[in-house]
Design a protein with these regions (language model features):
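Charged, amphipathic alpha-helical linker segments immediately N-terminal to NTP-binding catalytic cores
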Residues: 2-43
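Short hinge/gating elements
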Residues: 6-7, 22-29, 33, 59-64, ...
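Structural motif
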Residues: 33-45, 255-264
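Conserved ASCE/P-loop NTPase catalytic core
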Residues: 37-213
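Short, hydrophobic-biased segments on the C-terminal half of alpha helices
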Residues: 78, 268, 363-367
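Phosphate-sensing "switch" segment of ASCE/P-loop ATPases
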Residues: 155-161, 171-320, 325-327, 447
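Terminal-proximal interaction/regulatory segments of ATP-powered molecular machines
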Residues: 314-472
Length: 472
């Protein structure tokens, strides 16, 4: 990211108020080192990483299989951060990160590509675990000087938000479970449909390169300056946020597993990240940025699917695998045979649905779904062949919000708890609830999305909003 700009550019940019969809458009027009490297079909994932990592400085990991777009997404997001503010961990000797500590401490962001390799380096692994906890990394080094008494010197690497990528198919790879709980994880789209879109886009790019850029350089510079301004505001200290709408969300968040206690923090960060990105359109109350109802909707639209799947312990492609199973039917005390599927049958059904996965990957997903209770496992015959059927735990979760009603509720809440900001909140946030969808750019009135009904969602082409979590 080039940060050189004239004083005139900076002054003119003060009135520029971008939408999150402008960031999506930027991802369609990414250039790195003069090369056109756009990202298509991963809009929500890219926006999620942008809001969590760039805006809110939340450690993040992008998971996928080989060729799933991990590095492409990471590089696109990183291109919005000034070069002088980011550091890339290049794996060397065990102590190499400590030798480079002064350079790391000068930066604001860290990129750790190929996490599976980082986990094999003890010092890097412990460094990332400390950062995941929000802690500074420390170590003591013995100093020996001839003729003097030995001494101990303490070395530190300050806390940094880090972004990393992880290849799922590497059999020797692992993510330390302590680290996994402390970072937000994003899964890329590995469907056959997405592969077809990527192929189509790349072929179109070489056929009509003059038509591929859909955002001019001046607009890109305005967006960069806007982000640079926010990064400057938050370089020393992150601001505090006040979200009166937050309590309304608790009715929609799965509470089956205790892990949701951790993941709620990531949803809060994405909501706050939206408020921070729209800083010019938000106001402060008692030195806190007041989050708008729209920011809550943006966060559900962008992060909703992966947030709910994470809370429900559904692994990557787990929802798709569950859809392959027939309804469980019990006669007497026995589950009917036709309710069970073997690994090769699941693999074939996934293939027909557009997901080409090796049997080992299918087994891993089935194992995780069984551990969580979504599937039941049975052993058949002398060979003890594993078969699976739907378990007792349902992955369905009603998450719809009646936005018109909830807007009235939040206004009543503010009148009671924060009467001093009621007038400004109502005027700035509640008079016009027509917003731009951050994914597809459509104009949507939140008040028209009533009761979370699928027909309303389909008509507005915003299923990812998760007013109702898509059922198996």
């Amino acid at each position: 990211m080039q940060t050189t700009s004239s004083f005139k550019d900076i002054i003119e940019n003060q009135d520029y108020k971008p939408q999150l969809h402008d960031v999506t458009r930027y991802f369609y027009n990414v250039k790195i080192d003069g090369k056109f490297v756009p990202v298509h079909g991963e809009e929500s994932n890219c926006l999620m990483v942008f809001l969590a990592y760039v805006m809110m400085k939340t450690p993040a990991i992008i998971e996928s299989y080989s060729g799933g777009g991990k590095s492409c997404m990471a590089n696109a997001v990183l291109s919005l951060i000034p070069e002088e503010e980011k550091y890339s961990i290049e794996l060397g000797s065990d102590k190499s990160v400590w030798y480079d500590r002064e350079k790391i401490n000068e930066k604001s962001f860290v990129y750790a590509p190929e996490l599976q390799k980082c986990m094999q380096n003890l010092d890097v692994r412990e460094l990332l675990k400390n950062w995941g906890e929000g802690k500074t990394a420390e170590r003591k080094v013995a100093i020996s000087i001839f003729g003097q008494e030995d001494s101990v010197r303490e070395q530190t690497i300050n806390w940094h938000p880090f972004l990393s990528t992880f290849a799922l198919e590497n059999k020797d790879a692992f993510i330390d479970e302590e680290l996994r709980r402390r970072v937000v994880t994003i899964h890329t789209d590995c469907s056959r449909k997405q592969t077809r879109e990527v192929l189509k886009n790349k072929l179109q790019r070489v056929a009509t390169p003059h038509k591929m850029m859909t955002m001019d350089e001046k607009e890109i510079m305005k967006l960069r300056l806007h982000i640079l301004h926010i990064l400057g505001q938050t370089k020393e200290k992150m601001p505090s946020f006040l979200n009166p709408f937050a309590p309304i969300l608790h009715k929609s968040i799965p509470d089956v597993f205790t892990i949701s206690r951790s993941y709620i923090d990531y949803l809060i960060n994405v909501i706050n990240g939206s408020a921070l990105f729209h800083l010019k359109e938000r106001f402060k109350f008692e030195d806190m940025i007041v989050v708008a109802p729209q920011d809550n909707w943006f966060a559900l639209r962008i992060y909703g699917t992966q947030f709910f799947e994470s809370c429900l312990k559904i692994p990557m492609l787990g929802k798709e695998v569950l859809k392959m199973f027939p309804k469980k039917i019990i006669q007497g005390e026995q589950i009917l045979d036709e309710c069970f599927l073997e690994v090769n049958q699941v693999q074939q059904k996934m293939k027909e649905a557009g997901y080409l996965l090796e049997s080992g990957k299918i087994r891993a997903i089935l194992g995780l779904l069984t551990m969580s209770g979504y599937l039941e496992e049975a052993l058949e015959g002398k060979e003890k062949k594993k078969r699976y059927c739907l378990g007792n735990l349902s992955s369905d979760w009603s998450t719809h919000l009646e936005w018109e009603r909830e807007i009235k509720n939040v206004k009543e809440f503010i009148q009671k708890e924060y009467p001093g900001m009621y007038e400004e909140y109502d005027k700035k946030y509640c008079q016009n609830l027509t917003i731009t969808d951050p994914i597809n750019g459509e104009r949507i009135n939140l008040l028209e999305l009533k009761n979370g009904k699928n027909e309303d969602i389909n008509n507005k082409n915003v299923r990812g909003m998760l007013d109702e979590f898509i059922k198996c």
